[in-house]
Amino acid sequence: MSNVYTNELDAASGQTILIPSGYNLSLGGTILNENSIPPDPEEENGKYLVSDGTSASFKHIGPTSISTFYGSGTWTRPEGINRVIVRVIGGGGGGSGHAESGAAGGYAEEVIDVRGISSVYCTVGNGSQSGTYYSGNGDGGGTSSFGNYLSASGGLGGNQTYQHCGGLGGLGSGGNLNIYGGGGTGHMNYMGFGGGGFFGSGTLSAHGNWNQGARSNQLKAPRGAGGTSGYQGSYQGANGMAGAVIVMEFV
């Protein structure tokens, strides 16, 4: 069989270049056939070449889409998606009075091959309610999970485990990466920040001039953060923030 070698092929618009039977076409030193893909700088810019064992094609670098769950629901695998990176964070614990703040939810992350999976149920843990005084113990946040693959428990509320203490952070499990959420602050004479999670810490704290600062701004905090405490006993702390499940989708 003979070879035709060229570094450039030109054809008029709408025309076809025919290679005679018995000849191979070599473009830039590479023989082209039904399993070869000539590079197109304009169409394939920013992509990489991937093979499924039968044929090769150009694909995008990085995730092609992201599914975010701020409430529980079902993730359905989009057509052509083969792998995902899943991130889960548990709900934050609520703040109590006297600066005893809630802890952040734990965090887990995992790479999952989803070629044999059609759907997975995602559970998003709620943020817990806040309290006042020593006896108004902030509740613990809820657990977030991606099916049975990975999960992250919620942070505990201020004054929940021991009196005068901040909450204990939640913990991720089942992932390639599993970490604790940040703990809450203990008793003091001003507001204590809510525990910091993977996405950041609780809302602002303040002194006596703005006693309701934490409560009034409790939604201005990232997912999974612990609730900032109230100033002194009678002022209610901030609720813990709900968790989240984030699915980054790759071809």
Locations of regions flagged by a protein language model:
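Hydrophobic residues at beta-strand termini and immediately following loops
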Residues: F69, A152, R223
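Short hydrophobic/aromatic-rich beta-strand motifs
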Residues: S36-P38, N45-V50, I85-I89, K220-G224, ...
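Glycine-rich strand-loop-strand elements at beta-sheet edges
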Residues: T68-Y70, T74-P78, I85-N148, C165, ...
